Curated annotation (Swiss-Prot):
Name of the protein: Equilibrative nucleoside transporter 2
Compartments, record wording: Apical cell membrane; Basolateral cell membrane
Originating gene: SLC29A2
Stated role: Bidirectional uniporter involved in the facilitative transport of nucleosides and nucleobases, and contributes to maintaining their cellular homeostasis. Functions as a Na(+)-independent, passive transporter. Involved in the transport of nucleosides such as inosine, adenosine, uridine, thymidine, cytidine and guanosine. Also able to transport purine nucleobases (hypoxanthine, adenine, guanine) and pyrimidine nucleobases (thymine, uracil). Involved in nucleoside transport at basolateral membrane of kidney cells, allowing liver absorption of nucleoside metabolites.
PTM notes: Glycosylated.
Tissue: Highly expressed in skeletal muscle. Expressed in liver, lung, placenta, brain, heart, kidney and ovarian tissues. Expressed in testis at the blood-brain-barrier.
Further details from the record: Transport activity is insensitive to nanomolar concentrations of the inhibitor nitrobenzylmercaptopurine riboside (NBMPR). Inhibited by higher concentrations of NBMPR (1uM-10uM).
SUPFAM superfamilies in the cross-refs: MFS general substrate transporter
Transmembrane segments: 13-33, 70-90, 99-119, 124-144, 162-182, 193-213, 291-311, 324-344, 360-380, 386-406, 432-452
A biological-process GO annotation: purine nucleoside transmembrane transport
Similarity annotation: Belongs to the SLC29A/ENT transporter (TC 2.A.57) family.
Keywords (A to Z) from UniProt: Cell membrane, Glycoprotein, Membrane, Phosphoprotein, Transmembrane, Transmembrane helix, Transport
Length: 456
């Protein structure tokens, strides 16, 4: 595909569209976990009285439903499932149906979540409806992201960067929306309703952006040239892009420029190598080359999802009740995590250390397991076994800074190193494997969160 023949992206409309699509894909997950106090208060029997739901640093008196854990697990299991089913779906369901259908389904399910703010119901049915919504929303999100990654694989890598930038802002956007809801001064029920309507508006904008792409000459040029190799490229691009997405954690746009080696400028070179295509690389051979890097990726996400947000969302301020104690968790847990994780991912734009041959990488990854007891020993009032050894707010903030930066950097580093450990024709298989291990790490972490919470 000759890049010189491509039309210009007038007013950067295609870039803006993919940025908004990136933002829309991760808004649901981020808005659910950031609103944990709201859900836990409803499940604790607060009914429809939201007067103290969004205005206090309250995580539920007992959290008998283990909402933190279940919302994390039921968000990540669909990712693992659809990672395995993606190749089947891509062959059987047209791309437009996958993308537009997923967006509409997410919109309707989130509208249901917003409507429930006004509905008074007992905790049991509310929990069941919410968990079903979480599961279905994240199933559709997994299909949506995989399909959009396929489209991005046919376009210049700049648009992958813009897409990831949008996804990277989703967590920050959700945290800011929560803070604005709490500080708005309106009654709490209206505040909660406005909070949950916000992602609906984001999804609507995503639908408009997707529908506008066929009407933009620049998008038509690249998407019309989608060849039979697009599905293979989709898997490879997806693995490199997914370094940030499925757990709602932001990504560095600079990092993508490093990892997306298959730019469109290099695509023409792959076509003359068509005779090599019958020699499909062995999955086992590729796994032997990247197994340590893949294991590191699994362990990084296992540690992160085992305590975030299941444990970290339960940490409260040790100061006397006031404005700071109300805003402590949204700021120090969610906003701080998303910002520092993004900065951690950005570091790989400037250096990649340790390299793929170093044994220091597994050591650094294993050291992150120390964060599990550190967070468990912070100021979590709802506990029956472990003592509180780090009651001051400064401890939690320091741990969160290091936790978030290390997560962002090590995830970005492992996803960057994996393609360098295999031959060019093996990258498709390596990409599919890394995508699977990413989803596996998220699911393992979400499952372990039940154990760690029980040990508190």
């Amino acid at each position: 595909m000759a890049r010189g023949d491509a039309p210009r992206d007038s007013y950067h409309l295609v870039g803006i569209s993919f940025f908004i699509l990136g933002l829309g894909t991760l808004l649901p997950w981020n808005f659910f976990i950031t609103a944990i106090p709201y859900f836990q208060a409803r499940l604790a029997g607060a009914g429809n009285s939201t007067a103290r739901i969004l205005s206090t640093n309250h995580t539920g008196p007992e959290d008998a439903f283990n909402f933190n854990n279940w919302v994390t697990l039921l968000s990540q299991l669909p990712l693992l499932l659809f990672t395995l089913l993606n190749s089947f779906l891509y062959q059987c369901v047209p791309e437009t149906v996958r993308i537009l259908g997923s967006l509409l389904a997410i919109l309707l399910l989130f509208a249901l979540t917003a409507a429930l703010v006004k509905v008074d119901m007992s905790p049991g049915p509310f929990f069941s409806i919410t968990m079903a919504s979480v599961c279905f929303i994240n199933s559709f999100s997994a299909v949506l992201q995989g399909s959009l990654f396929g489209q991005l694989g046919t376009m210049p890598s700049t648009y992958s960067t813009l897409f990831l930038s949008g996804q990277g802002l989703a967590g920050i956007f959700a945290a800011l929306a929560m803070l604005l809801s709490m500080a708005s001064g309106v009654d709490a029920e209206t505040s909660a309703l406005g909070y949950f309507i916000t992602p609906c508006v984001g999804i609507l904008m995503s639908i408009v952006c997707y529908l506008s792409l066929p009407h933009l000459k620049f998008a038509r040029y690249y998407l019309a040239n989608k060849s039979s190799q697009a599905q293979a490229q989709e898997l490879e691009t997806k693995a490199e892009l997914l370094q940030s997405d499925e757990n709602g954690i932001p990504s560095s746009p600079q990092k993508v420029a490093l990892t997306l080696d298959l730019d469109l400028e290099k695509e023409p070179e792959s076509e003359p190598d068509e005779p090599q295509k019958p020699g499909k690389p062995s999955v086992f051979t590729v796994f032997q080359k990247i197994w340590l890097t893949a294991l590191c990726l699994v362990l990084v996400f296992t540690v992160t999802l085992s305590v975030f947000p299941a444990i970290t969302a339960m940490v409260t301020s040790s100061t006397s009740p006031g404005k700071w104690s109300q805003f402590f968790n949204p700021i120090c847990c969610f906003l701080l995590f998303n910002i520092m994780d993004w900065l951690g991912r950005s570091l790989t734009s400037y250096f990649l250390w340790p390299d793929e041959d170093s044994r220091l990488l597994p050591l650094l990854v294993c050291l992150r397991f120390l964060f599990v007891p550190l967070f468990m020993l912070c100021h979590v009032p709802q506990r029956s076994r472990l003592p509180i050894l780090f009651p001051q707010d400064a401890y939690f903030i320091t741990f969160m800074l290091l936790f978030a930066v290390s997560n962002g950097y090590l995830v970005s580093l492992t996803m960057c190193l994996a393609p360098r450990q295999v031959l060019p024709h093996e990258r498709e298989v390596a990409g599919a494997l890394m995508t699977f291990f990413l989803a596996l790490g998220l699911s393992c972490g979400a499952s372990l969160s039940f154990l760690f919470k029980a040990l508190l």
